[in-house]
Amino acid sequence: MNLIPTVIEQTSRGERAYDIYSRLLKDRIIMLGSAIDDNVANSIVSQLLFLDAQDPEKDIFLYINSPGGSISAGMAIYDTMNFVKADVQTIGMGMAASMGSFLLTAGANGKRFALPNAEIMIHQPLGGAQGQATEIEIAARHILKIKERMNTIMAEKTGQPYEVIARDTDRDNFMTAQEAKDYGLIDDIIINKSGLKG
């Protein structure tokens, strides 16, 4: 059961009811609080594009509590974060794992944060293949290309050498917020909104 709270605002023209996500969007806040699939990605991408069209000079705040999910859906979000003119500040909370950690690290330079008790997990892309040997070989080559591309991006965003990223993502690698900061996945640990930029 998915209950979405409603917020009532009083204005000079009367009352207005918003679902909580629409109200947060007014403050340029986007929540990624689930596994990443095409539907979630389409929603996040739409919100990024809307906020950028509204004011490309004001930062967007993407809060992430996600176990990860689809690589192609996550890459759609990643590409849109880079496509929009507005800086996207990322804030990790709870667990940012797999594609969730990738998106956390993809925030604007100097504007990637985690709350003190957030956990961040990086690993290599997961994929499954079945069918004839040739089909399995094609799928394996494809996942290796994706792994190389994602490791290259992570190396650029963290400042870690590619070889270190490749080694450290070989298996599930869990980090505290402080370890993620030391590694370069985030820029700072914040305890309240005053730690955000802008």
Swiss-Prot record:
Active site annotation, chain numbering: 98 (nucleophile), 123
Entries under InterPro entries matching the protein: ClpP (IPR001907), ClpP/crotonase-like_dom_sf (IPR029045), ClpP/TepA (IPR023562), ClpP_His_AS (IPR033135), ClpP_Ser_AS (IPR018215)
Catalytic reaction(s) noted: Hydrolysis of proteins to small peptides in the presence of ATP and magnesium. alpha-casein is the usual test substrate. In the absence of ATP, only oligopeptides shorter than five residues are hydrolyzed (such as succinyl-Leu-Tyr-|-NHMec, and Leu-Tyr-Leu-|-Tyr-Trp, in which cleavage of the -Tyr-|-Leu- and -Tyr-|-Trp bonds also occurs)
GO molecular function (one): ATPase binding
Catalytic activity, EC: 3.4.21.92
Gene Ontology cellular component terms for the protein in this record: cytoplasm; endopeptidase Clp complex
Matching PROSITE patterns: CLP_PROTEASE_HIS (PS00382), CLP_PROTEASE_SER (PS00381)
A Pfam family per the record: CLP_protease
Keyword RNA-binding included in the entry's annotation: no
Sorted UniProt keywords: Cytoplasm, Hydrolase, Protease, Serine protease
Localization in the cell: Cytoplasm
UniProt superkingdom: Bacteria
GO biological process, one term: protein quality control for misfolded or incompletely synthesized proteins
Subunit structure as annotated in this protein's UniProt entry: Fourteen ClpP subunits assemble into 2 heptameric rings which stack back to back to give a disk-like structure with a central cavity, resembling the structure of eukaryotic proteasomes.
UniProt xrefs under PANTHER family: ATP-DEPENDENT CLP PROTEASE PROTEOLYTIC SUBUNIT (PTHR10381:SF70)
Family of the protein in this entry: Belongs to the peptidase S14 family.
Annotated HAMAP family: ClpP (MF_00444)
Function: Cleaves peptides in various proteins in a process that requires ATP hydrolysis. Has a chymotrypsin-like activity. Plays a major role in the degradation of misfolded proteins.
Name of the protein: ATP-dependent Clp protease proteolytic subunit
Organism, scientific name: Listeria monocytogenes serovar 1/2a (strain ATCC BAA-679 / EGD-e)
Lineage: Bacteria, Bacillati, Bacillota, Bacilli, Bacillales
